[in-house]
Amino acid sequence: MEKASLNIAQTKEIPLTDRRMGLRGWKACSRPHLLGRILLFMSILFITSAELSSDVSSREVYMPIFNNKLSFKVPPIKRSLLLGAALYEDFEYSSNNSASDGAFCTVFNAGMNDASREVVFEIHVMDVLQEETDSSRFGGTSHERGRQSLGFSVFNNKNGDLLRSKKNLASGTSVIEVNPGNCNEFLICFINLVYDGSWSSIDTEKSVTIKMTYNDKLDPDMLLHLVNQMTPQVVKALNTVSDGLFQIVSDTTLLQMESDRRDINEATYSYLIVGFVSLMVAQLISNIIVTTYLIIKIKSNPSSHIKKKGL
């Protein structure tokens, strides 16, 4: 009986040992899978936090050079930090694609056979904060306070001739026309200058998208742009101005008004000289009259003490 119970106990003990060994083996095998899951979870958290902590400018999509279009950002530069006596607002051509310190330059190849065709640059500018900032905290950004400007210049990349330049390029869409002459390669430069050196200055980056085209290709796009911009308020203002101009022209008073104003402007100096000379003559005559009157008065009425002495 005791042997039988011992055998039963042994037979029951063997499966228990097997189960423990199997559990240990399962734990050992599951450790790599658990470690991989932890690493995957940490990588997902890292990517999510990186996306959430990105600033405003990183949310923009910047296109490569395709179809003569290029998008980029121009960082702000303090004007006071630019050393030297040179006027950094005025670009100077340089063969290494750098117009001046702090400028961003790029080269556009027109790729046209007829060099006399007019080239048109369509530029879209947008102000972008460098970080999540309350721009109204110190009274607005430097651009809103008129202390920041974007400069733009186009050079002939072969000989360095300045073809077109514009200071304080406005935000929004601007269309700039250039007569290239014999040039088919352009050096285009931007510089984002800030004239406010105070600690409360909130500077903005300039998000620039530039597209190069020709007049014949741009005409349909320009027509659509004008149609979209032709609001009822603009139409009313244009009608008011045109009615006033046509009324002046129809009354033939515009030329007469211009002639009268021109005569007044030309006669101003003569009137001034005549008036000054007349004033001096009047003052001299008045002095002579007063002096003569005093002399006559003194001679006609001698002093009383002179009469008493019998003189």
UniProtKB/Swiss-Prot annotation:
<comment type="function">
    <text>May be involved in the modulation of rDNA transcription.</text>
</comment>
<protein>
    <recommendedName>
        <fullName>Regulator of rDNA transcription protein 6</fullName>
    </recommendedName>
</protein>
<keyword id="KW-0804">Transcription</keyword>
<feature type="transmembrane region" description="Helical">
    <location>
        <begin position="32"/>
        <end position="52"/>
    </location>
</feature>
<keyword id="KW-0812">Transmembrane</keyword>
<feature type="transmembrane region" description="Helical">
    <location>
        <begin position="271"/>
        <end position="291"/>
    </location>
</feature>
<keyword id="KW-0472">Membrane</keyword>
<dbReference type="GO" id="GO:0016020">
    <property type="term" value="C:membrane"/>
</dbReference>
<dbReference type="InterPro" id="IPR009038">
    <property type="entry name" value="GOLD_dom"/>
</dbReference>
<keyword id="KW-0805">Transcription regulation</keyword>
<keyword id="KW-1133">Transmembrane helix</keyword>
<dbReference type="Pfam" id="PF01105">
    <property type="entry name" value="EMP24_GP25L"/>
</dbReference>
